[in-house]
Amino acid sequence: GFPEWLPQQRIVELEIQDEIRRRFELYGFAPLETRSVEPLSVLVAKGETDKEIYVVDRLAAGTASPERDADRRLGLHYDLTVPFARYVVQHYNELDFPFKRYQIQRGWRGERPQEGRYREFVQADIDVIDRDRLALSFDAEMVRLLHETLAALPIPPVTIAINNRKITEGYLRGLDVADVIPAMRILDKLDKIGADGVRRMLDAEALTGAQVSAALELVTIAPGGREVIGRVEELGVRHALLDDGLAELAFVMDELSTLPAGAAVANMAIVRGFDYYTGSVYEGSMRGHEDLGAVCSGGRYENLAAGARVRLPGVGVSIGVSRIVGRLFARDLVPTPRKTPTEVLVLVPEERLRWRAQEVTHALRERGIPTEMWHEPSKLNKQLRYADNKGIPYAWLPGRGDDEGDLVRDMVSGDQGAGDPSAWLPATDRATARSRARVRAEERG
């Protein structure tokens, strides 16, 4: 449940994080990192109470220590949205609104470990929050940014499912369901426990048979485009909140009409278990890997930062970085040939060439090219084998002087040619590596 990647895997994970960061910044989101702990009272008040929160305590604290009691009120955050809301309230006077931030940070949940579910994990979140009112167009922008970001990663295509909690809540209220929040949480479990499981749980919540059947009619509507809204209306349930949700969903789907077919679909089964979501909600899954569950999710909230002096509505999404890279590595969906960021290994075949090897190494590093130098003379085969084993693309053989210049060997092709450390550039770079990985992912996806 606490993944530790090999160096070649960690390189891929960092490249994915770098690409996510770059895409977030293209849309004007600013970087942020919040503390790892939050008051337990804050963490447990935001829904999903079945999530196991890790409590922070001091092992050496005495039973009568007031500090120990204070520590017991702290827990590790299980997502990044709750800490973000607390941060906004705390720094309200120092922020410019609408406030747009991204976080790529760890979270912790005491879940049963399995593929795609970890007790310690990395998430990449974006949120935008404003005073009093947040434009609905931000809901569509979140989906567009998600699509563009995930399309740039070395993963199979992702379908983003969209719903609006006002639809689900308004529909249940139109059915005269007495307590809609527990019913919504149950409906959100459809993909995990199936229609029969949902029916049994709703029966236990004292819903009538007619209410249960009608609720299942809603969440089992086939996902699709704007036509899904018409199918909901055909069910004949009426409520003002339902009408508001359908209008908002129609607006978002219209805004996203230029995305590739299948990139974003309306799906009535997406409810989201967190109580703070009040409008648009999203979940995305990799095509051909739906068994993994959602690789991104999020939604709109109207009351999350309730401690602020004014109402602060917002909308945000989260990408499950650890879930994505865990599947990539488990299914060999992305190449991991390089165990180091090193581009060049400078060889030292004999002691008298050490000075030249040092000059080359320093010159390449000064130009921003990651470079290692072999530290003691040894057989060239040994040095070249080291470069090959670590996936270093180039080996640099220092020349003996004016009559013999430097040589650079391409470790993949075996080709070699003259090298000048003041001008030479590697033919491979991170962008090329990502491009190759993307092609391979598409072939497998």
What are these regions (language model features)?
Residues 1-10, 63-64, 68:
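Auxiliary tRNA-acceptor-end handling modules of aminoacyl-tRNA synthetases
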Residues 5, 54-56, 295, 304:
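Short clusters of hydrophobic/aromatic residues that line enzyme substrate/ligand-binding pockets
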Residues 12-27, 38-41, 69-71, 79-95, ...:
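Positively charged, Gly/Ser-enriched RNA/tRNA-binding surfaces
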Residues 32, 36-74:
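Polyanion/phosphate-binding surface patch
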Residues 33-36, 162-164, 399:
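Glycine-rich, histidine-containing beta strand-loop boundary motifs that form or position
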Residues 52-66, 175-203, 207, 286-288:
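Acidic, His- and aromatic-enriched active-site or binding-groove loops in soluble protein domains
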Residues 159-176:
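Glycine-rich, mobile lid/loop segments that gate access to catalytic sites or pores
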Residues 164, 191-194, 224:
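Short, solvent-exposed helix-helix connector turns and helix-capping sites enriched
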